[in-house]
């Protein structure tokens, strides 16, 4: 009897392995949902949409963008963490992914344990822009204006804990200005209200604002990266404008639920790598102020872990609190 049970168990295991192998070879056989934890029109959404066509070509299945904004990206990220780990649910997010755990200690997901890295797709600076009515053309003039009117100027970000929020609080910390943070639920609404003059300043990813800078609806003051952006060589960095040790870089990347089959993860990683090498994709990203990243999934994993430690230090030093 035991022999028959053992034989049945072994047969079941072998059949399971064969089925898994066949499933891996068949993957993907239906559309893939790309969960973007921010509303349409923001930088994350823009970069995701640039990648959808080449990803569809590489995978042979449609890529369906599903915008799930709210709570500084935490709503959509939680949805992705709890989605079926079958290779058909992928989170496409930005570097707030490594900021939020240090700002919101009771999140319903764990960014290290609940996700596996697929691709760091693009690197991008935040850009500081102002409404054209603001009488400041550079960082020094903006600092002088803010100091002359303490508490009167406000700055928008895509949400509490976003890279733009971190950049704004660092700006306050390092320059001594008193400006008021106005968090939005995504880049689209934040940009719209800055263009409309409801807020005077905005720290946001370049894809969300750059076309409006070029059209004259917003004025670029500086970028937050260590060096000038290739897409905007005439826009100075905040550091070179006289604010020392000021660097806030952002990334956009894809992650899958942690238990996604290894074969599906590998296929997704290869598809994203192929898409990011596409000359048209690289050109489209550059036009938005972003640069396609050439980073392996293991390097992406290391970046996530390093940033968790970095932002923990910055958040404590700047005394940033949820709003």
Annotated model-derived regions:
Residues 1-5:
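N-terminal secretory signal peptides that target proteins for export/translocation
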């Amino acid at each position: 009897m035991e022999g028959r049970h053992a034989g049945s168990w072994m047969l079941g295991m072998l059949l399971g392995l064969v089925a898994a192998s066949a499933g891996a070879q068949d993957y993907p056989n239906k559309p893939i949902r790309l969960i973007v934890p921010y509303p349409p029109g923001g930088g994350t959404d823009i970069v995701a949409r640039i990648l959808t066509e080449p990803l569809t070509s590489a995978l042979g299945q449609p890529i369906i963008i599903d915008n799930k904004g709210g709570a500084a990206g935490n709503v959509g990220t939680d949805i992705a963490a709890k989605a079926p780990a079958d290779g058909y649910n992928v989170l496409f997010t930005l570097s707030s992914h490594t900021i939020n755990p240090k700002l919101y200690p009771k999140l319903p997901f764990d960014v290290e344990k609940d996700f596996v890295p697929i691709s760091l797709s693009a690197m991008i600076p935040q850009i500081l822009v102002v409404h054209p009515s603001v009488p400041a053309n550079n960082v020094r003039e903006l600092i002088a204006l803010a100091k002359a009117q303490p508490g009167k100027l406000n700055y928008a970000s895509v949400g509490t804990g976003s890279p733009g929020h971190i950049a704004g609080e660092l700006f306050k910390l390092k320059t001594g200005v008193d400006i008021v943070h106005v968090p939005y639920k995504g880049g689209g609404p934040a940009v719209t209200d800055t263009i409309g003059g409801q807020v005077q300043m905005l720290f946001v990813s370049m894809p969300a604002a750059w076309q409006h800078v070029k059209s004259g609806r917003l004025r670029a003051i500086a970028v937050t990266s260590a060096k000038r952006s290739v897409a905007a060589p005439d826009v100075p960095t905040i550091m070179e404008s006289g604010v020392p040790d000021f660097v806030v870089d952002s990334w956009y990347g894809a992650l899958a639920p942690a238990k996604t089959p290894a074969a599906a993860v590998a296929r997704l990683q290869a598809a994203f790598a192929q898409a990011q090498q596409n000359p048209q994709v690289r050109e489209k990203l550059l036009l938005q102020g972003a640069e396609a990243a050439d980073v392996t999934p293991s390097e992406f994993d290391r970046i996530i872990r390093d940033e968790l430690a970095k932002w923990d230090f910055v958040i404590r030093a700047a005394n940033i609190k949820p709003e």
